[in-house]
A protein has these predicted regions:
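Non-catalytic, conserved peripheral segments adjacent to functional cores
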Residues: 1-103, 123-125, 132-133
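A short beta-strand-loop-alpha-helix capping motif that often carries His-Thr
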Residues: 116, 128-129
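Conserved metal-binding segment of the jelly-roll/cupin
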Residues: 102-123
Length: 135
């Protein structure tokens, strides 16, 4: 049985963890990485990606340092696994809070602007996807 799409809040306001259904068979797997109607129904903001990037990492242990650009991001993994880490860099009560999660193809994270984003690959040949969002 395939799991349902679930969205989880975190200690960082606006940082959301998504459990994504992955449908597999002997050929491989398929997932809806983003489906607007389903995501909105579960509380994600309505957004329009302005750019989509893929970071391919050949070796396990590759680290990408903390980035905190002035836009929201939607991150996921197309293949492999990562250890993701986020830190709230915004002024206010949540400044300095951190969240860590292992991500594979069945997980995504919505990252609000002002929250630092970083990861380390846990497997060779990991492909990390990043949609930059203008709201």
């Amino acid at each position: 049985m395939t799991k349902e799409l679930e969205v989880h809040t975190t200690e960082i306001p606006g940082l959301l963890i998504l459990d994504l259904p992955v449908h597999g068979d002997n050929r491989g797997w398929f997932k809806e990485n983003w489906q607007r109607e389903k995501m909105l129904a579960r509380g994600l903001p309505d957004f329009s990606p302005i750019q989509n990037n893929i970071s391919f990492n050949a070796a396990r242990g590759t680290t990408r340092g903390i980035h905190a650009e002035p836009w929201d991001k939607y991150v996921s993994v197309a293949s492999g696994r990562i250890f993701g880490a986020w830190v709230d860099l915004r002024k206010g009560d949540s400044f300095g809070r951190t969240v860590t999660v292992e991500l594979g193809p069945d997980t995504a994270v919505y990252v609000p602007r002002g929250v630092g984003n970083s990861f380390q690959t846990l497997e060779d040949n990991t492909a990390y996807t990043l949609s930059l969002i203008h709201i």
